[in-house]
Amino acid sequence: MTKYALVGDVGGTNARLALCDVDSGEILKAKTYSGLDYPSLEAVVRVYLEEHNATVTDGCIAIACPITGDWVAMTNHVWAFSVAEMKKNLGFDHLEIINDFTAVSMAIPMLKTDHLIQFGGGEPQPNKPIAVYGAGTGLGVAHLVHVDKRWVSLPGEGGHVDFAPNSEEEAIILEQLRAEVGHVSAERVLSGPGLVNLYRAIVKADGRLPDNLRPKDITERALDDSCTDCRRALSLFCVIMGRFGGNLALTLGTFGGVYIAGGIVPRFLDFFTSSGFRGGFEDKGRFKSYVQDIPVYLIVHDQPGLLGAGAHLRQTLGQIL
């Protein structure tokens, strides 16, 4: 008899839940709920299980916030809960709550070639360290290492490291943003809001007033070539994405590959492909040769968070991925 577990991927707006075949890892019956419609995550889980007439005793839910102990308070939502209490209330034997980028990193060993688009480099080396990052509402970062036949995710808040410019143009951007926000993290330029920051800094550095644009506006104007400032901002975004990915590769020797998780990059994929991304990735001076064979992939699987939550749980239950 097939055994299923509950898996979830929860952000500030929506909660996506599904069932995972514990043996195969297949994700089934995924459904998205608006977080605004429910008083708690537990309430959403109960609705999902009732709608699908599912009886499960194990679960893993990925959440877009730091996970540091039993008490989980979401960054972009009012939901807050005790993992132990929720596990008890649901009658689960196992309930894992993990960071959303922990889940994405755990999905990587499960991905097939048609779930990936490669941007330069050679072949990944088996069982070597992996980095994953993604620019969306914020900048998420995680690493994955292989230890004793197990994949171990190393979560963190790498998106909040200092933004380190490596060109005159980038130095001007830093100067402009520092005057506005003080500390300038990588997330201040590598995210949806970060794209707006880049555009504003470019315009203000030229002594002009920027328009009140959204990330979508900047992308559209860049792609139809109707705004030089927007095109510069998007080009710079791609280069800095490359630099940041190269930094991750250097830090942990990620010869297993560097992976970009969804976010805003797929919205301008053709532009990204022909941009200075790979040049920025390899622009490491004396250590260019160290990173030039490391492959970079864009993840195009439609639900890596659910896939990774399932992989994390299956490994916790004793399976070898």
From Swiss-Prot:
Keywords: ATP-binding, Cytoplasm, Glycolysis, Kinase, Nucleotide-binding, Transferase. It is found in: Cytoplasm. The keyword Transferase applies. Pfam families: Glucokinase. ATP binds at residues 8-13. CDD domains: ASKHA_NBD_GLK (cd24008). Its EC number is 2.7.1.2. It comes from the Bacteria. Gene3D superfamilies: 3.30.420.40, 3.40.367.20. It catalyses: D-glucose + ATP = D-glucose 6-phosphate + ADP + H(+). One of its GO terms (molecular function) is ATP binding. GO terms for cellular component: cytosol. GO terms for biological process: glycolytic process. Belongs to the bacterial glucokinase family. This is Glucokinase. It comes from Cronobacter sakazakii (strain ATCC BAA-894) (Enterobacter sakazakii). The lineage of its organism: Bacteria, Pseudomonadati, Pseudomonadota, Gammaproteobacteria, Enterobacterales. The gene is glk.
